[in-house]
Design a protein with these regions (language model features):
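An N-terminal assembly and electron-transfer interface module characteristic of large anaerobic redox
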Residues: 1-428
Length: 428
């Protein structure tokens, strides 16, 4: 087989949706063939009213006239849609690398003609995804780019970089309440544009995945919202450090003196620094959660015994970090499917290579790899990709850390691994 071919794993039945802000409209400016997947997805997800297309012709490419046509397309959307959008995302595909659209001039024209509306330009170029900022980082940043600085801070905390609700069984929310956080905000949970705008009033951003790091960095620079990086982890020591970092950030931000804080003189609304009683309650909740998860790890370890375990990058954002954690708990990790490797997993990747040299690493660019590895048929496969390729009977259905954080993530994973021992997944 050709060595330049890569695996493509079909995820039948799993809907593909794009994160967006409420009351927004996506306008794709590109040649017709560039948005076939986007338009098919819109039909499948019934989101046709939230997007439109401005197709470029050869004359547009030659003259640059499409820049003025964008404003006309916005005007048409405002007059024809049942609910006029509050914000527009202008998507420019990879052809813009050759056209060189004057983004600032385009935004100035749109904001001048349509005051009170939000506008952002999004560049979509998968061909250049390996250079500089990835498309995912840039798109995620644009989602928060319409937030405006506010003179007031409330007690809320934003979770950045997540695409799905963290489960109600997660200790994070009770711990936050103990620290005086009245609301945990997430972009996809915003009911309307005003709720989206309130994200700018939050006192702290907690970044749960690398894809949100660039957005949080820019929010810290533009809006003055400090951030704590706390990517989903399955290592108990790292989870403890993350909670200490979040608590420390909330305590530092909470230094209220006569209604103002030390950060750029912004006023706070009815919030005080966490008290010792609040710290004690948070510590109790965290100790309880940690004790529960240590019991869960012990039960799963006893149940699995020497059963081989395979970790997959479709299940978690940092597969080598998960492999390191599981190996540390005593599980028999035999392989890591790194079909979607990320740089933020590099340190753990090096650790696995040095400390657990027997672990096989499967990458998407090699068809021959799987055929020669002789991976065990009875392995517990954590993630769809490895389970699908191996037609594994024991399948742990986790997707990109969705719904998971802190000690709850480890506890739920242990429960799923135990359940997978009796699994009998049948593949087409």
């Amino acid at each position: 087989m050709a060595s330049d071919l890569s695996y493509f794993i079909p995820h039948h039945g799993r809907p593909k949706v794009s994160l967006c802000i409420p009351e927004s409209f996506n306008l794709y400016v590109c040649p017709p063939s560039c948005v076939r997947r986007v338009s098919i997805r819109a039909l499948r997800n019934d989101t046709r009213g939230a997007m439109g297309f401005l197709f470029l012709t050869e004359a547009d490419v030659a003259t640059g006239a499409y820049e003025h046509a964008v404003a006309e397309a916005v005007a048409e959307a405002l007059t024809t849609l049942e609910r006029p959008p509050r914000a527009f995302f202008i998507h420019l595909n990879c052809i813009d690398d050759f056209l060189g659209t004057d983004e600032d001039a385009l935004l100035d024209e749109l904001r001048g003609r349509f005051p009170g509306l939000g506008f952002a330009v999004v560049h979509m170029n998968p061909i250049a995804a390996d250079r500089g900022l990835s498309t995912g980082l840039r798109v995620h940043d644009r989602l928060y780019s319409m937030l405006e600085p506010t003179p007031h801070r409330d007690s809320a905390v934003n979770l950045v970089g997540t695409f799905a609700d963290i489960g109600g069984d997660c200790e994070l929310f009770e711990v936050m309440r103990a620290w005086g956080v009245r609301e945990v905000r997430q972009l996809f949970s915003c009911a309307d544009f005003e709720a989206y705008r309130r994200l700018a009033s939050s006192r702290l951003n907690v970044v749960l995945a690398h894809i949100g790091s660039y957005a949080a960095e820019n929010m810290e620079r533009r809006l003055g919202i400090p951030r704590v990086d706390a990517p989903v982890s399955y290592d108990l020591d790292e989870i403890g450090r993350q909670y200490r970092a979040i608590g420390s950030a909330l305590g530092q931000v909470g230094g209220v003196v006569d209604g103002t804080c030390s950060q750029e003189g912004r006023a706070f609304e009815g919030r005080q620094a966490p008290s010792s009683a609040a710290d004690d309650e948070a510590a109790r909740l965290l100790a309880q959660a940690e004790g529960s998860v240590r019991d869960a790890v012990a039960r799963a370890r006893e149940a699995l015994g020497d059963t081989p375990v395979i970790v997959d990058s479709s299940a978690v954002m940092r597969p080598f970090a998960l492999a390191k954690a599981l190996a540390g708990y005593g599980f028999s990790v035999c392989a890591v499917f790194a079909l979607h490797e990320k740089d933020d997993d590099a340190e753990e990747r090096a650790w696995v290579a040095a400390q657990v040299p027997g672990i096989a690493v499967v990458r998407g660019e090699s068809y021959e790899g799987i055929l020669d590895l002789g991976l065990p048929a009875d392995a517990v496969c954590i993630g769809f990709d490895c389970a699908y390729l191996l037609k594994a009977r024991r399948f742990v259905d986790v997707q990109k850390d969705e719904g998971l954080f802190g000690y709850q993530a480890v506890r739920r994973l242990m429960r799923l691994m135990e359940a997978a021992l009796d699994g009998d997944t049948v593949w087409e």
